[in-house]
Each structure stands twice: as structure tokens, then as C-alpha cells.
């Protein structure tokens, strides 16, 4: 299966009538492997900050997490594995695998739990595949 198929079929899938606003699979260096049409472009320093938070959980909490200049308040996650952010009525979930970052961005009416489920399910699958 291509990386684009993972995005199209597993991240942008319908969940209780709703979809993520955008999604992508990136390398740890920020290189886009596949993305949805409306996925924002990360700046290199944003990827650096995200990767540092995976290595040093809590690094982003004081400043927030920036994605294409949009600021997300960092909320509960799983240290070293998942970063979650909230911005207004939407948010973001980032799951780190051995080689990739699986990213989902949502807006209402999709819930944070639905976004977490979609992103983390694919991320867990990729981890089991050694990716």
C-alpha cells in the first residue's frame, strides 16, 4: 500500500459521519511522505520543536506547538509517543513511529477522541510493521 493510500483510506476515512480536516504522514525530518489536499506545510523549526518534545516530554507545553504558524495549546499525550494539541474548536494529534510522524488535524464536529483514534490506530499499525 502506498503512503498516500494510508492517508486517503486510513486517516481521511469517515468516522460517524465526520472526517479529519487534514492529515499527513511525515518523516522525522519533516519530509512529507503523503498528505491530504489541505494539509498545512510545517516549517523546519516546528518539526524540530515537535521532535524535541518527543525526546523531552513537556518541552512544548510552555510555548505551545506551532503548525504552519497556527498555535496549538499542548494537552495530555503519551510521553515519547503521542502529542496532542487544542486550538479553538479543533486540534491536532501527532503519533510518532520508528520512522514517521502520523498527523491528524480536526475541527468540530469531529471530536478529539475521534481524531486520536484514527491517528493512533494507524500509528500503532505502522509501529507493529517496523515503520
UniProtKB/Swiss-Prot annotation:
- Record's GO cellular component terms: cell cortex; cytoskeleton
Q: Which SMART domains match?
A: PROF (SM00392)
Q: Which residues carry this modification: Phosphothreonine?
A: 111
Question: Which UniProt keyword terms apply here?
Answer: Actin-binding, Allergen, Cytoplasm, Cytoskeleton, Disulfide bond, Phosphoprotein
Q: Motif Involved in PIP2 interaction at which residues?
A: 81-97
- Share the record's PTM remark: Phosphorylated by MAP kinases.
Question: Where does the protein end up?
Answer: Cytoplasm, Cytoskeleton
A Pfam family:
Profilin
Q: Which CDD domains match?
A: PROF
List, alphabetically, the InterPro entries matched.
Answer: PFN, PFN_euk, PFN_sf, Profilin_CS
**Record GO terms (molecular function):** actin monomer binding
Q: Is Disulfide bond a UniProt keyword of this protein?
A: yes
Q: Per its UniProt record, what SUPFAM superfamilies does this chain match?
A: Profilin (actin-binding protein)
Q: What does this protein do?
A: Binds to actin and affects the structure of the cytoskeleton. At high concentrations, profilin prevents the polymerization of actin, whereas it enhances it at low concentrations.
The remark listed among the other comments is: The variability of the residues taking part of IgE-binding epitopes might be responsible of the difference in cross-reactivity among olive pollen cultivars, and between distantly related pollen species, leading to a variable range of allergy reactions among atopic patients.
Q: What is this protein called?
A: Profilin-8
In its UniProt entry, the species of origin is given as Olea europaea (Common olive)
Amino acid at each position: 500500500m502506498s503512503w498516500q493510500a494510508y492517508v486517503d483510506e486510513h486517516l481521511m476515512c469517515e468516522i460517524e459521519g465526520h472526517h479529519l480536516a487534514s492529515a499527513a504522514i511525515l518523516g522525522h525530518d519533516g519530509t512529507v511522505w503523503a498528505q491530504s489536499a489541505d494539509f498545512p506545510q510545517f516549517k523546519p523549526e516546528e518539526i524540530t520543536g515537535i521532535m524535541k518534545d518527543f525526546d523531552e516530554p513537556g518541552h512544548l507545553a510552555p510555548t505551545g506547538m506551532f503548525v504552519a504558524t497556527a498555535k496549538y495549546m499542548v494537552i495530555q499525550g503519551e510521553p515519547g509517543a503521542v502529542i496532542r494539541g487544542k486550538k479553538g474548536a479543533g486540534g491536532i494529534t501527532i503519533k510518532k513511529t520508528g520512522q514517521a510522524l502520523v498527523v491528524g488535524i480536526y475541527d468540530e464536529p469531529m471530536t478529539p477522541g475521534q481524531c486520536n483514534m484514527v491517528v493512533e490506530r494507524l500509528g500503532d499499525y505502522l509501529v507493529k510493521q517496523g515503520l
